[in-house]
Amino acid sequence: MNKNTWVIGFTLFAMFFGAGNLIFPPNLGLDSGQFFWPAILAFVLTGIGLPLLGVIVGALDKEGYIGALNKISPKFSILFLIIIYLTIGPLFAIPRTASTSFEMTITPIIHSNSSIALFIFTIIYFIVVLYICLNPSKLIDRIGSLLTPLLLITILAMIIKAYLDFSGNSAGKGNEALYHSNFSSFAEGFTQGYLTMDAIAAIAFSMIVVNAVKLTGITKTNQIFKQTLTAGLIAAIALIFIYISLGYIGNHMPVSDMKLNELKSHDRNIGTYLLTTMASTGFGSFGKYLLGIIVALACLTTACGLIVAVSEYFHRIVPKVSYKAFVLVFILMSFIIANQGLNAVISMSIPVLSIVYPVAITVVLLILIAKFIPTKRITQQIPVIIVFILSIFSVISKLGWLKINFIESLPLRAYSLEWFPVAIIATILGYLVGIFVKQDPIKYQQE
């Protein structure tokens, strides 16, 4: 394993390790109570396992996901990737990095969620993002060689001290309405992993990793695949350690019901409160500055990776508009949405993610299956269409816009996983239909 692989792996870790990766694990730990392990393992599965798979699958075709999705349908490829890039880009994920940075660096100092302070902070934040992203060829070096080691050192310092401070406590009772059995806790942890957005971000980051590997002089698809896999494993191991550590500490932190109600009444995110408490308990007044460094680095690296990925994709499909113009447009969009506040951004993203995630997971698994089992285009199209339609109606029913009894009666509906058995059945149906349709098996392009 050479130095370039380590740098690419650390860069991938830093791009994945953003806002959600900090605030969701301790919150999950607090809520899961006595059922911490099934919850955190499921969270790791969707928060790390699926993203790792997503990055690796993107290296199966020399054109990445663009080429692989074109095998399903060229029109679907464009539509799906536009939705993916906007979701992980200026509509939700990038604004969340800015609003999380504000809540965890500025709010503890000024003791207020001032809209004016948020406005000023996001201006400075996105100016820094703009500077880094205007030259994407240096992104890997700037993040992997400089920012990631600094991020790892600071996060490790906080985790070790917080573990010593709180590991002696027993686990709290948690949210017993959601976490009341091993299965319910696993299902809840699985769906909570959606909120990191990493499984769909992997589709974008895969292209950055593959291009970075190619820049090292590797051109053969099988070698690119191996290097991408190795870099992905480096990122995954680091993320697993941090997720479980933050979750375990959150699980053992004493937080009263009165305090939780107070946080909710002031529209404070509970995950950010837990992290702030970890830092201040371990390092006193210096703790909030240490945490500020961690958050700023984590969110900044993710925002830069996303801006570059989104801008490069849109420049590719609309070459008449320059890459730099897209960078400016998406940063402006992110700035506007970030000023709605962290909780508002998270709330807005949940319905969209509930539609996009099942389709994204289905697509990634179908591409992987097609690598090893002869698969026709119709075989992939059927489950994708069915899961997409089901996800839309599931969200409509869950929001109460229209109660759909059929949706509510599906297996695993209570855990928001009703799409999974349907996806399996639809895939089997796709293979059966494929027997009667004259199409050549899908073959992914090699160098």
Swiss-Prot record:
It is a multi-pass membrane protein. Pfam families: Branch_AA_trans. GO terms for molecular function: L-isoleucine transmembrane transporter activity; L-leucine transmembrane transporter activity; L-valine transmembrane transporter activity. The chain crosses the membrane at residues 6-26, 40-60, 74-94, 114-134, 143-163, 193-213, 229-249, 290-310, 326-346, 350-370, 382-402, 417-437. InterPro entries: Brnchd-chn_aa_trnsp_Livcs (IPR004685). Keywords: Amino-acid transport, Cell membrane, Membrane, Transmembrane, Transmembrane helix, Transport. Component of the transport system for branched-chain amino acids (leucine, isoleucine and valine), which is coupled to a proton motive force (Potential). Contributes to NaCl tolerance. PANTHER family: BRANCHED-CHAIN AMINO ACID CARRIER PROTEIN SAOUHSC_01411-RELATED, BRANCHED-CHAIN AMINO ACID TRANSPORT SYSTEM 2 CARRIER PROTEIN. This is Putative branched-chain amino acid carrier protein SAR1419.
